[in-house]
Regions:
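Active-site substrate-recognition segment that forms the wall
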Residues: 1-122, 127-155, 171-173, 180-182, ...
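C-terminal lid/capping helical subdomain adjacent to the catalytic/cofactor pocket in oxidative enzymes
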Residues: 148, 152-264
């Protein structure tokens, strides 16, 4: 079995494989940019992730937030995200990636996706055109006295939104991940942009079911999956939820912390 999981480059690798299921798929690259605080005193004052609401007509992925994170063991303060544009499919990819991915088989999908997502296209153009001062103005909705000298813009990463065929619109822009599998199950490809690590387990379970159905759909296979993920394909009652929450907290060392928060 061949599994293609190369982030933004998955599309380019998939297009080299001779399977019918790849036809009609395209990708649109979007870079993620953040304002990163350089003032350690300000960083020390913030201890949470604070969300606002997306602007009127803006996509869900644009929800701005002020976020404390630990990067390489060091506490940091970020604000964003802001969308940028680069034709690269990876942060260190080639400027030709987008153009290499376009073919006669996916042009209708891509044109249809853009035509039916004009508000998103307009949003991305506005984001790319934003100056540093414009971004600081957005930040001041969270921190009124934010100073430009305390912040800098950093390109965090690159993602590729999946574009696929649609019978009604010609093409459709996907905001999640997509698992593509050949009919014989010998090739599986993971494409798209995941909202975070919380979805990783579900995605890989989907991959396993498509790649190895003859193993997964057996009594032994189901037993092994239930050992690893007790709530997999189980109706989640309050009792089962609390039981597994407790196990997770113990494994992560969070149980005592939650008890202290409740008592306070």
């Amino acid at each position: 079995h061949v599994f293609i999981g190369a982030g933004g480059s998955s599309l380019l690798l998939l297009q080299k494989v001779e399977i019918d299921e790849k036809d009609g798929y395209g990708g649109f690259p979007v870079s993620g940019e953040w304002l990163v605080c350089k003032n350690r005193d300000i960083i020390a004052q913030h201890q949470a992730k604070v969300y606002s609401k997306a602007g009127l007509g803006d996509p869900p992925m644009s929800v701005p937030h002020l976020d404390t994170r630990y990067i390489d063991g060091k506490r940091e303060l970020l604000f964003g995200p802001f969308a940028g544009f680069s034709p690269k499919f990876l942060k260190e990819g080639s400027n030709l990636d987008l153009f290499k991915s376009i073919s006669f088989k996916n042009i209708p999908s891509m044109l249809g996706a853009f035509w039916h997502n004009l508000p998103l296209t307009e949003y991305l153009i506005k984001q790319v055109a934003m100056s540093f001062s414009d971004r600081m103005d957005d930040l001041r909705k969270f921190i009124k006295d934010a100073k430009e000298e305390d912040w800098e813009v950093v390109v965090a990463g690159q993602r590729v939104q999946t574009i696929k065929r649609d019978a009604y619109e010609g093409g459709k822009l996907e905001f999640g991940t997509e698992v593509i599998s050949s009919k014989d199950g010998k090739i599986t490809c993971l494409m798209g942009a995941s909202p975070g690590a919380s979805t990783a387990v579900k995605i890989m379970l989907d991959v396993l079911e498509k790649a190895f159905p003859e193993r997964i759909n057996t009594a032994r296979g189901q037993e092994m999956l239930n050992q690893m993920v007790p709530t997999w394909k189980t109706e989640l009652t309050k009792e089962i939820f609390e039981e597994n929450l407790l196990k997770s907290e113990e494994a992560l060392g969070l149980g005592e912390k939650r008890q202290r928060e409740i008592s306070q």
